[in-house]
Amino acid sequence: MVDLLVTYMEMRQANPAPARVKPAAGASVALERLDSASYISLYRAVGEPVQWDQRLRMAAEDLERLLALPSTHIYVLRVGGEAAGLCEFNGVGQPDVELVHFGLVPAFQGRRLGPFLLDQALRAVWSHAPQRVWLHTDTYDHPAAQSVYSRAGLKPYEQRMETFPD
């Protein structure tokens, strides 16, 4: 078991700032319906460095069901057609939307692509008029994660130590 400091963040209205400028030629963000193999491939590429394993522990049928839900939105950042990151939301179309996974493939980090992906994805989710978008982040996440979330308009509302399996 491992103890992690978990920070819960939320936003209750869309960020009023202008949309972020595309940081690289050929960068685009789009809602994609990924099959489970494509999803797991991107999930691993983004998540292995920060020890994501939630989706890897799911039964294949459960993952397929989750990916097929109309309330599951996965925004994929592509650079020159190559998948470079993802931003996954659950509960789109409901009052509370959870930002479940967000991150970049390590080769694409450090180029301002993360804030661009998050901004584009949040704008798309806010077009569905939720009352709140929330997430949790922890000490295993990328060191820049909380500052990226804060600049996107998310504010911390709770912190606590939680115990997770190794």
Predicted regions and their residues:
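Conserved GNAT acetyl-CoA-binding A-motif
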Residues: 125-137
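Conserved beta-strand-loop-alpha-helix junction that forms the acyl-donor binding cleft
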Residues: 109, 135-145, 157, 162-166
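Short hydrophobic beta-strand segments in globular cytosolic domains
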Residues: 84, 156-157
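A conserved beta-strand-loop-helix scaffold within acyl/acetyltransferase catalytic domains
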Residues: 58, 67-73, 78-97, 101-106
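Conserved acetyl-CoA-binding loop-helix of GNAT-fold acetyltransferases
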Residues: 104, 110-127, 146-151
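Acyl-donor-binding surface of acyltransferase catalytic domains
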Residues: 1-27
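Short acidic/polar active-site loop segments enriched in Thr and Asp
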Residues: 73, 131, 155
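Short amphipathic alpha-helix that is part of the acyltransferase structural core
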Residues: 23-55
